[in-house]
Amino acid sequence: MSATVVDAVNAAPLSGSKEMSLEEPKKMTREDWRKKKELEEQRKLGNAPAEVDEEGKDINPHIPQYISSVPWYIDPSKRPTLKHQRPQPEKQKQFSSSGEWYKRGVKENSIITKYRKGACENCGAMTHKKKDCFERPRRVGAKFTGTNIAPDEHVQPQLMFDYDGKRDRWNGYNPEEHMKIVEEYAKVDLAKRTLKAQKLQEELASGKLVEQANSPKHQWGEEEPNSQMEKDHNSEDEDEDKYADDIDMPGQNFDSKRRITVRNLRIREDIAKYLRNLDPNSAYYDPKTRAMRENPYANAGKNPDEVSYAGDNFVRYTGDTISMAQTQLFAWEAYDKGSEVHLQADPTKLELLYKSFKVKKEDFKEQQKESILEKYGGQEHLDAPPAELLLAQTEDYVEYSRHGTVIKGQERAVACSKYEEDVKIHNHTHIWGSYWKEGRWGYKCCHSFFKYSYCTGEAGKEIVNSEECIINEITGEESVKKPQTLMELHQEKLKEEKKKKKKKKKKHRKSSSDSDDEEKKHEKLKKALNAEEARLLHVKETMQIDERKRPYNSMYETREPTEEEMEAYRMKRQRPDDPMASFLGQ
């Protein structure tokens, strides 16, 4: 390491005319440098005492030189110190002390009767100026009148606490305030004692204490547990054990009368899950979660309803699990139909919607059931007898055949029609639906197909039959074709020949145009191949010229290449990976 050289430093003025005189830096000899290094090594090994700063503190010899050396602009005297590495006092934040706190209440001062210099010209307070005054502007300010001077505002100090000061729960607490509570309790205690002394004096005057002292129980040391005297004398003890029975610890009971603790021991007769079936191939027991999900008696052939424990899987289907699954299914179906509901995002809305849906569904089923029963009947079939009478004996005799048909006894009811029976309107002698023809219903008496038409009798039948005959004749005439003349046949033949000639001409034109297009494409491809060869030749010549002598010509074109140019490029490009590329030029 080379010797440190201190540059010349201009003397800084200190205390007026005095100047700090600095010694000229001397160059270290090789011997001094060696001694200095040996001393540093001895200090690091602990054989030599460490350096001491101006405060008498030892300097750790293991601190590097770039940390321990003092900069010339801080201390030119080059004394050994670490003061420049410590926090500088002028840069430290000044925090409020723990005793400082905000003012509570208003300080009562004497009334000011004279205007003070620097006070508000309007009201006379010292804590603000005229432009910041909140009072109503006076006609003549307090500066000139000197009367009715307002008191100074209660200004709170600006406190800035450190980390501990902000979290000090007792900061600003005045212990003298607690003395008020102590005095209040002392007064209550004094009142209790005076009342107690007054009661004792009254009992002594009435002679009750003398009778209790002369009683045989008191002479033998026995005391009446429920006497008023014992209650009065032991009131303080009762206050201590007043709530002792209400705060029992789990597993024990505290008796305040006898002051003993009674343990509640519980006999455990339950069996551990892993001891129910010792077969290693039975249900798996998870020691981490203490769970056995499967039934341990599954391979033993026991009924799961008869055993005391059938696995933990039954919990998955208890409680609200099934209802929650139904709610989730309803949410999915409602979301598919356009409702913005979600089980996790808005469970309350989904629950209310699902409840209203179930109520509406039940109402709809009841309405549908009632409407069907009103229309078709059959309420008596729904009123089934009790279950115990379904397979019991009855007095109704029914005889069946081999095929299940009823031979004797209960007859099968005839199916009722949806139309009203035996209701004849508008002079009809038959009901509606008694006549059917060509997919339409009508009246048999007049062959009318209109339900609310009047009956026409046999005349209506004849009219309908005559209309049908006329319609059949018209359709028959139209179906017979008129015979064509020779002239008409000749004209049709000429038209067909013209059509055939036109088709042949169109085919010929298409074939000729296709051949012309192929020739044009071939010529364009030939021109594109020639242009591609010229371009490749130009590139080859340009690459042979020295880089410094090559012309700077941009080969970029803005137009899009044609299909023939792309085909020529594909045909002429080099393919080094193609094994047959060498035979292309031959």
Swiss-Prot record:
A GO term for molecular function: pre-mRNA 3'-splice site binding
Biased composition (Acidic residues): 235-248
Family annotation (InterPro entries): Slu7_dom (IPR021715), Splicing_factor_SLU7 (IPR039974)
Region ranges (Disordered): 1-63, 77-100, 206-254, 496-586
One Gene Ontology cellular component annotation held by this UniProt entry: cytoplasm
Glycyl lysine isopeptide (Lys-Gly) (interchain with G-Cter in SUMO2) cross-link site: 349, 408
Compartments where located: Nucleus; Nucleus speckle; Cytoplasm
Keywords carried by this UniProt record: Acetylation, Cytoplasm, Isopeptide bond, Metal-binding, mRNA processing, mRNA splicing, Nucleus, Phosphoprotein, Spliceosome, Ubl conjugation, Zinc, Zinc-finger
Biased composition (Basic and acidic residues): 20-44, 529-550, 557-578
Protein's GO biological process: alternative mRNA splicing, via spliceosome; cellular response to heat; intracellular protein transport; mRNA 3'-splice site recognition; mRNA splicing, via spliceosome; RNA splicing; RNA splicing, via transesterification reactions
Chain ranges of zinc fingers (CCHC-type): 118-135
Pfam family membership, one: Slu7
Residues bearing PTM Phosphoserine: 215, 227, 235
Chain positions with N-acetylserine modification: 2
Listed Basic residues bias regions: 498-510
Main location: nucleus
Motif (Bipartite nuclear localization signal): 129-169
Keyword Nucleus recorded: yes
Family assignment from sequence similarity: Belongs to the SLU7 family.
Functional summary from the UniProt entry: Required for pre-mRNA splicing as component of the spliceosome. Participates in the second catalytic step of pre-mRNA splicing, when the free hydroxyl group of exon I attacks the 3'-splice site to generate spliced mRNA and the excised lariat intron. Required for holding exon 1 properly in the spliceosome and for correct AG identification when more than one possible AG exists in 3'-splicing site region. May be involved in the activation of proximal AG. Probably also involved in alternative splicing regulation.
Record note on domains: The CCHC-type zinc finger is required to retain the protein within the nucleus and prevent its shuttle back to the cytoplasm via the CRM1 pathway.
Subunit description: Component of pre-catalytic, catalytic and post-catalytic spliceosomes. Associates with the spliceosome prior to recognition of the 3'-splice site for step II, probably during catalysis of step I.
Listed name of the protein: Pre-mRNA-splicing factor SLU7
Organism the protein comes from: Homo sapiens
Lineage of the organism: Eukaryota, Metazoa, Chordata, Craniata, Vertebrata
